[in-house]
A protein has these predicted regions:
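N-terminal Sec-pathway targeting helices
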Residues: 1-15
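Membrane-interface motif at the C-terminal end of an N-terminal transmembrane signal
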Residues: 18-36
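Histidine-/acidic-rich catalytic cores in large beta-rich domains
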Residues: 35-41, 56, 61-77, 82-85, ...
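Sec-dependent signal peptide cleavage junction
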Residues: 48-52
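Extracellular low-complexity, O-glycosylation-prone stalks/linkers
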Residues: 89-97
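Solvent-exposed serine/threonine-rich low-complexity stretches and specific carbohydrate-binding patches
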Residues: 96-106, 525-543
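Surface-exposed, short loops/turns at beta-strand junctions within beta-sandwich domains
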Residues: 113-121, 547-554
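Long, highly charged alpha-helical interaction/scaffolding segments
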Residues: 528, 536-575
Length: 575
């Protein structure tokens, strides 16, 4: 009898324990939100509006903002009986110059339309096969938080090119004409550099933030907002990228798992997304290194010398490396600001010279000349250097003082023509004269002067995702038996959790002194990731990171560990 009672008691205990387990691991947990795959969504959109192209020039199909992220762009679709060119003209507003573009001959015309005005009935003229058709495309006003031009001085300067800008922190990637009108913008969190590739597409940072200051990688798109390639990079991307002559991309990155940051660049194969070369300044340059000791913020490649030139904001130096071997060719730096180990690489000054001090935005002008932004007595200056390779000397040719001490980014258009971005201000200078100055009501990162149209032939090819974030680095695990249930934790720390194609994105706001980890558990496996390491400072900070898809598979329950206490978030994620 006692054995029977014992069995029943054991059964009750097991059932009770199983019930608790089922509740804790199944009933009490909800899935986190999953974001729709961008490339899948754009393919579905294309299938819908390209399924029928049987329209005429007299009654074309007009699709405003076809990909949902470029509100001042459109597609016009129609067919002609014969192979013929087509020309579109976007009529200028209030007497401004018209924008005209002629497309290559075809019978099925799928025409990208760029340069529409916001909140306006845009008049667009289409001409093909001797027929002229005027249509109206009505656009929505700019968002309330848009970076608008607040002050413009252009000395009646007219140009058919546009000023493409990226935001420093918050804002929109956009293009302004010389009248200060917004003629194109993207919806999405695109930061760092913007540039036009040789194929006419633009290259931007991914709008996915890997962690503070680093995006997941790069996106190649057209001005319609169609993504052709999305590149994931294990160390993420920051500041600058350069298109090499072979088409590959050389970009500033990072190396996770060590204490130093922003001292690595990588070359990624354009066709595969694989890293084919790593430039690790930590191992290349001499001297002591800790934290953000170098601070890569610009990279240039010189085909004539097969070398790369890199600026180090915190290192106060310009470094040139032989690209095949990564041997140090030369360094421009004040010998009193660098370790003695650099002495054999330093170029000697030919005359008086202002050495790089928090240098930014190196641009190679021609041959042995370069221009960069540097700080002198608290002010930003544009310096022009000339290098004598034979004698290993550097000469300062010019010094142009800038109007403010804000971060400065520079684009060389020609030897005597360049665009400067400083804080809220865009300035173009030709022959040492300011020809346009434009202020906006938000802080900008960089500006490139480019045309809207460049080799624009619309194709319905499917976008491709390449590369990988690699496996996320884990730390030591902790017992979860003491985990607390506290639903207020999500709100208290503003915890955000969602899943996308790259992995689990986690963000939250903590005290800088907080020690924070994310714990993933699926009973059979447990993984712990650092979200924030404690800092010896006051205040709060918002942090975010990705836990990569690579190296993890299955259903995991999510816990948050803060200063030694573990909390159940009652959420799970499927990898």
């Amino acid at each position: 009898m006692k054995k029977i009672i014992a069995k029943y008691v054991l059964l009750i205990v097991v059932t009770f324990a199983a019930s608790i387990f089922i509740y804790e691991y199944i009933m009490a947990n909800k899935p986190i939100d999953t974001e729709t795959d961008l490339l899948y969504a754009q393919t579905q959109s294309e299938r819908q509006y390209l399924s029928n192209t049987n329209y005429t020039i007299d009654n074309p199909n007009v699709i405003l903002n076809p990909y949902g992220n470029s509100p001042l762009s459109a597609l016009i679709v129609f067919q002609t009986k014969d192979l013929t060119t087509s020309t579109v003209t976007i009529k200028g507003k209030d007497g401004a110059e018209d924008l005209t573009h002629t497309f290559t001959p075809t019978k099925v015309h799928i025409l990208p339309i760029y340069g529409l005005y916001a909140g306006y009935d845009n008049k667009v003229v289409i001409e093909a096969s001797g027929i002229r058709k005027e249509i109206t495309i009505t656009t929505s006003p700019l968002p309330d938080d848009f970076s608008k031009v607040t002050d413009l001085s252009n000395a009646d300067y007219e140009t058919d090119e546009f000023y493409f800008t990226t935001p420093e922190e918050i804002g929109y990637t956009a293009a302004y004409d010389s009248e200060g009108e917004v003629r194109w913008y993207l919806i999405g969190d695109y930061k760092w550099d913007i540039q036009r590739l040789n194929n006419g597409h633009i290259l931007l940072s991914s709008d996915k933030i890997l962690s503070k200051n680093y995006s997941v990688g790069l996106i190649e798109m057209d001005l319609l907002g169609k993504v052709y390639y999305e590149y994931a990079v294990p160390g993420g991307y920051h500041h600058d990228v350069y298109e090499l002559n072979n088409g590959n991309l050389l970009l500033a990155s990072n190396k996770y798992g060590r204490s130093t940051v922003e001292d690595v660049a990588v070359e990624i194969d354009r066709a595969t997304g694989n890293i084919v070369k790593e430039i690790d300044l930590y191992n290349i340059l001499p001297g002591d290194k800790k934290g953000n000791w170098f601070g890569i913020n610009s990279i240039n490649y010189d085909i004539n010398t097969n070398s790369i030139t890199i600026s180090g904001y915190n290192g106060n130096m310009i470094v040139n490396l032989d690209y095949p071997t990564l041997d140090i060719n030369w360094v421009i730096a004040d010998k009193d600001k660098v370790d003695d180990d650099y002495s054999q690489y330093l170029l000697k000054a030919d005359g008086d010279i202002d050495y790089p001090n928090n240098p930014e935005s190196i641009n190679l002008i021609s041959g042995n000349k370069m221009m960069l932004a540097s700080e002198i007595d608290g002010k930003k200056h544009l310096l022009t250097y000339q290098i004598d390779y034979s004698n290993r000397t550097v000469k300062q040719l010019d010094d142009y003082e800038l109007p403010s001490d804000e971060e400065t980014y520079l684009e060389i258009i020609g030897e005597d023509d360049y665009v400067i971005t400083q804080g809220h201000t865009i300035i173009e200078i030709q022959n040492n004269k300011k020809i346009i100055s434009m202020n906006v009501n938000s802080t900008l990162y960089n500006t490139k002067k480019m045309s809207l149209y460049a080799n624009d032939v619309y194709t319905g090819v499917q976008g491709v995702r390449l590369g990988s974030l690699g496996e996320s680095v884990t730390t030591k695990n902790y017992l979860l038996i003491s985990a607390k249930s506290d639903d207020s934790i999500l709100d208290e720390y503003k915890i955000s959790l969602y899943k996308d194609v790259f992995g689990l994105k986690v963000s939250g706001t903590f005290k800088k002194s907080d020690d924070v980890q994310i714990v993933l558990d699926n009973v059979l496996d447990k993984k712990t990731y650092i979200l924030q390491e404690p800092q010896d400072s006051n205040g709060k900070v918002t942090v975010s990171r990705y836990i990569s898809e690579d190296g993890i598979k299955g259903k995991y329950y999510i816990y948050l560990r803060i200063n030694g206490k573990i909390y159940k978030l009652h959420k799970y994620v499927n990898f």
